[in-house]
Amino acid sequence: MKVVHTVGKRRTAIARATATEGSGKIRINKKPLELMEPKYIKMKLMEPVILAGEILGSIDVDVDVKGGGTVSQMDAARTALGKAIIEFTGKMELKEMFLSYDRTLLVSDARRTEPHKPSKSSKGPRARRQKSYR
């Protein structure tokens, strides 16, 4: 039995996907993809599924997401799901299709929050007093 593990990251959200042979079930945090709310998040998570088409009929994917907010979790899960589909099937034309549609389906977003500097640490990394000319 073939098993594939992949990881997707977005800011502080980390998604771990496990793809196995099965009947096409996709679960995010043990919840079926069809029951995800709000609709925007469900539609964004459906993108790699729609692009893959009938290939997913023989793959089960379980995604566990921790950390971050709802949109960051959605982006991390989407990346992990896309990577799992490509790694499990091994089809290069599908990989090229994902990359041409949206690069973030396979490549995690490298941007992170900037650390706060010591001057006004609670106000943010670049907080300064407002300058008055008069």
Curated annotation (Swiss-Prot):
PROSITE patterns: RIBOSOMAL_S9. PANTHER family: RIBOSOMAL PROTEIN S16 (PTHR21569:SF16), RIBOSOMAL PROTEIN S9 (PTHR21569). This is Small ribosomal subunit protein uS9. The gene is rps9. Pfam families: Ribosomal_S9. The keyword Secreted does not apply. GO terms for molecular function: RNA binding; structural constituent of ribosome. One of its GO terms (biological process) is maturation of SSU-rRNA from tricistronic rRNA transcript (SSU-rRNA, 5.8S rRNA, LSU-rRNA). GO terms for cellular component: cytosolic small ribosomal subunit. It comes from the Archaea. Residues 118-134 have a biased composition (Basic residues). Keywords: Ribonucleoprotein, Ribosomal protein. The keyword Ribosomal protein applies. It comes from Methanococcus vannielii (strain ATCC 35089 / DSM 1224 / JCM 13029 / OCM 148 / SB). Residues 109-134 are annotated as: Disordered. Belongs to the universal ribosomal protein uS9 family.
